[in-house]
């Protein structure tokens, strides 16, 4: 569960309505793979991930990033039940993919960086604080199966 004030919820949803999921999702996942290269091991089937340019222009990275961000958007509609919303994804990432749950936190932080880059001054410190709460809640929900 993420505790946001009414103003924070409105701000988070207001900005989210402007997010170009394909663009932001691909960039966020791409940056995760570049900044934290050990995360690439989960995406070996995506082809060439040998350089930053290869990662950022990889169509499979872009497509999966979009999928990830669509799932994040679903979570925004269920902030009071993130664990339930992400239960199946948590199980998949824990039991089948064996993803280190720390990677969820890293991706959340990268997403905040990408949102700041895309929205500039509109992404105020208060809005960043609200999004940090949300990405922490999502990361916690995705890591739930690990506990």
Curated annotation (Swiss-Prot):
UniProt entry tagged with the keyword Heme: yes
S-nitrosocysteine PTM sites in chain numbering: 94
GO biological process terms on file: hydrogen peroxide catabolic process
Phosphoserine modified-residue sites: 45
Binding locations of heme b: 64, 93
UniProt GO cellular component terms: blood microparticle; haptoglobin-hemoglobin complex; hemoglobin complex
Pfam families referenced in this protein's UniProt entry, alphabetically: Globin
Modification N6-acetyllysine occurs at: 60, 83
Domain of life: Eukaryota
Residue stretches making up the Globin domain: 3-147
N-acetylvaline: modified positions: 2
Sorted UniProt keywords: Acetylation, Heme, Iron, Metal-binding, Oxygen transport, Phosphoprotein, S-nitrosylation, Transport
Alphabetized GO MF terms: haptoglobin binding; heme binding; hemoglobin alpha binding; metal ion binding; organic acid binding; oxygen binding; oxygen carrier activity; peroxidase activity
InterPro entries: Globin (IPR000971), Globin-like_sf (IPR009050), Globin/Proto (IPR012292), Hemoglobin_b (IPR002337), Hemoglobin_oxygen_transport (IPR050056)
Entries under SUPFAM superfamilies matching the protein: Globin-like
Tissue expression summary: Red blood cells.
Subunit structure, as described in the record: Heterotetramer of two alpha chains and two beta chains.
Functional summary from the UniProt entry: Involved in oxygen transport from the lung to the various peripheral tissues.
Family the entry assigns: Belongs to the globin family.
Protein name: Hemoglobin subunit beta
Originating species: Camelus dromedarius
């Amino acid at each position: 569960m993420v505790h946001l004030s009414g103003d924070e919820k409105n701000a988070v949803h207001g900005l989210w309505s402007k997010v170009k999921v394909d663009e932001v999702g691909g960039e966020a996942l791409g940056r995760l793979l570049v900044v934290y290269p050990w995360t690439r091991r989960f995406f070996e089937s995506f082809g060439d991930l040998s350089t930053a340019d290869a990662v950022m222009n990889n169509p499979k990275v872009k497509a999966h990033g979009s999928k990830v961000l669509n799932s994040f958007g679903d979570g925004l509609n269920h902030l009071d039940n993130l664990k339930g919303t992400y239960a199946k994804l948590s199980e998949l990432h824990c039991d089948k993919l064996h993803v280190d749950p720390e990677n969820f936190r890293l991706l959340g932080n990268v997403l905040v960086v990408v949102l700041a880059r895309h929205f500039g001054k509109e992404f105020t410190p208060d809005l960043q604080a609200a999004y940090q709460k949300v990405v922490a809640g999502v990361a916690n929900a995705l890591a739930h199966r690990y506990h």
